[in-house]
C-alpha cells in the first residue's frame, strides 16, 4: 500500500515538474477525481490563489446528474469551468492531470473545457 502511494506521488511530481517548465505564467487547470465526484480549479501559481472552480457537488450540477462519477458529468464540469474562466478573462491555461491517466473522466473534462473555449 505504501509503495502505491509513493508511486502516485512520484507520478504527480513528475507531471507538475513538466508543467512548471512550460507554464510561462499561465494559470493551471487542476483536476481531482474521487470515486464519486470530479473537481477542477484554475490556479494562479504565481500568487497561489484559485481563480475559478467547479465540481460535480454543486447544487445546480447535482440536479441534472445521477452521479458525479460519469464521463458525462466530467464533460459538463469541463464546460462549466470553461464558461466561468472565460467570464473571468482567462482563455489560455495549462492542463494538470495530476497522477491520473489522460483517459475517461479526465479526458472528458479536458474535452468539455476545450469546447467551452479554453486553450491548452
UniProtKB/Swiss-Prot annotation:
It comes from the Bacteria. One of its GO terms (biological process) is translation. One of its GO terms (molecular function) is structural constituent of ribosome. The keyword Ribosomal protein applies. The keyword RNA-binding applies. Belongs to the universal ribosomal protein uL18 family. This is one of the proteins that bind and probably mediate the attachment of the 5S RNA into the large ribosomal subunit, where it forms part of the central protuberance. This is Large ribosomal subunit protein uL18.
